[in-house]
């Protein structure tokens, strides 16, 4: 189990998880606000 935790804390694994989460957020934003180049605050 300790080796698995060390594996999960390596930079490539963390980067893959982070980019997957970021892509999901961007896909959902694009689904609710299509073709939004900027988000009006008012």
From Swiss-Prot:
Gene3D superfamilies given in the database record: Single helix bin
Give the range the annotation lists for the signal sequence: none
Its subcellular locations are: Plastid, Chloroplast thylakoid membrane
Q: What is its main location?
A: plastid
Q: Which InterPro entries match?
A: PSI_PsaJ, PSI_PsaJ_sf
Kindly state a single biological-process term from the GO annotations of this entry.
photosynthesis
Domain of life, per lineage = Eukaryota
Q: Could you tell me the keywords of this UniProt record? A: Chloroplast, Membrane, Photosynthesis, Photosystem I, Plastid, Thylakoid, Transmembrane, Transmembrane helix
Q: Name one GO cellular component term.
A: chloroplast thylakoid membrane
Question: Membrane-spanning regions, if any?
Answer: 7-27
Q: How does the UniProt record describe the way this protein sits in the membrane?
A: Single-pass membrane protein
Describe the family membership recorded for this protein in Swiss-Prot or TrEMBL: Belongs to the PsaJ family.
The task this protein performs is described as:
May help in the organization of the PsaE and PsaF subunits.
Show the HAMAP family listed in the entry. Answer: PSI_PsaJ (MF_00522)
Q: What is this protein called?
A: Photosystem I reaction center subunit IX
Protein source organism: Ostreococcus tauri
């Amino acid at each position: 189990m300790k080796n698995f935790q060390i594996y999960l804390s390596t930079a490539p694994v963390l980067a893959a998880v982070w980019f997957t989460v970021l892509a999901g957020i961007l896909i959902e934003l694009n689904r609710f606000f299509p073709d939004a180049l900027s988000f009006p605050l008012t």
